[in-house]
């Protein structure tokens, strides 16, 4: 039967290759080229490993944060963080000026390709001579190529960031060895802590001990820095099936757009009063060619006006186009002629203060298109008592009243009188009207009582206004104002008392309350206070403002979002709150998630976990109009040897090899190498090494015999 062994070997290899794990796992990320001139945390004096440099929780920025920014902190000193404030630029793009310790760096996309080790069933990246960006970044310019390891130039100063995800299968672990700083976060928790300037150090994590939920998807974030000559090493071993959840418009996994967009060059609009910014990372950009260019990106850039908030209501703050700086200029309060308002001064809280020009004794205080509305006769009638036997008008001293039925002095015997507003005349006999009254007194009129002259004042002397002193001289009548009221007090024409008049105090600004007040020491003083709009309102979702022309206004409170993933909303009792942004896709096999650095919602294919991750693969079955989606487990075919209980390989097992393997063998035998190569390529078969076949391992169950295990004759 030995003649069958070569054939059996070939068939088993072919079948295993078809269903083996992918031979490589590519992890995409970003390298940030650093230089000691711009960040003195690179190339300091040598150090050693230092734990607890960074916080144990990864924030929404998805980069580590130092525990302390104090350069004299012992941990920072031991970890060779010479200038802790520059740590923020280890894993984030910085387009700072190329000046000493500015933090400037150059972002470069990178792919790490891990190869599958079938014996260990892990993916491995191993490079003990790890210089991935020689002649790139700053080192495009030869003046930066000043560091070497004794045998030649290399770029020794860079930081690597990988922001990925994985769906937990329940069997994962991670192993690392290398230098210098290495931090690994799973589910945003620090699980590998190899900080500091050190030679090769080892770190590992048994993911099954982290309390993760099988089938759930978690973040896997890896951070690595090379900060010192003369060596650079890295080795990763893991069975984590990490994947990239999203790409920026530069094509970088979880990127921020900085590898192909620079806000100062790509997005510069040439205006000093705008803040130029690259598009959000998930922006869909139409490319003119195969490679994205500045010209492609520029239309999607944002240019936000520089904000220059006004310091108060009496000053404007605007951006100076020549400098880009905010410049304050005072407001000019001008007369509002159409409103009959004369500008007086400016109050920082209320704005421009005005005085009405409609304050004359015959002004009503109302302005009509720039003209003061005068008191009408009816207005004066209402003001002075509205006696139907009087005629009312407004004169230079204000409202006045005259008899409706005046006496004619030339006919003293015909006495005029008014009866309920109707003029009548009573004719007197000679004895009643001619009793020796002095005709020379022009301010009196005849009046006889029992043939005795009892003169009466001529009509019109009393104007009915208690605020004037009425006199008659040689028949000339005078109404002199009684100026006994001070400040904003005015005389009441009916009672003659001084009343407080708020009208006098009006300043034409609807945002002030203007009141005439008196105290024991001061009479008639105008007080102006700022209107408190909404003072009694209890609804925290209504906001109030005041317009000096229209007064109090109300509007709904607009609660701002916090970042990209917290949506602002308003609660009438608590005010502004936030809630997580919903990214539900409605499709079972598509997962929606909000990522702060992505600028909002992302969507990626759901990865299903298998019941047994070593022997099965998880498959997602999408929902339909009538059925819900679900995950199912499918056995690997052929089943790996370690997954068979009490498996004994025999010719019967071999005879059960799939038809695909037999067909491949036939093509190989009868078609030669070229025919076989064509068959392989036409099916896009990915081959790993022959040692990926678990049938060449000893039976892990301890029973039965594997005839191909350690049998050199089979090879």
UniProtKB/Swiss-Prot annotation:
The chain crosses the membrane at residues 652-672. InterPro entries: Fibro_Slime, PA14/GLEYA, PA14_dom, Prespore-cell_inducing_factor. Residues 690-715 are annotated as: Disordered. Glycans are attached at residues 149, 377, 528, 622. It comes from the Eukaryota. It is a single-pass type I membrane protein. Pfam families: PA14. Residues 673-715 are cytoplasmic. SMART domains: PA14 (SM00758). One of its GO terms (cellular component) is extracellular region. Residues 115-256 form the PA14 domain. Keywords: Glycoprotein, Membrane, Signal, Transmembrane, Transmembrane helix. It is found in: Membrane. The keyword Glycosyltransferase does not apply. Residues 1-20 form the signal peptide. Residues 21-651 are extracellular. The keyword Signal applies. Belongs to the prespore-cell-inducing factor family. This is Protein psiH. The gene is psiH.
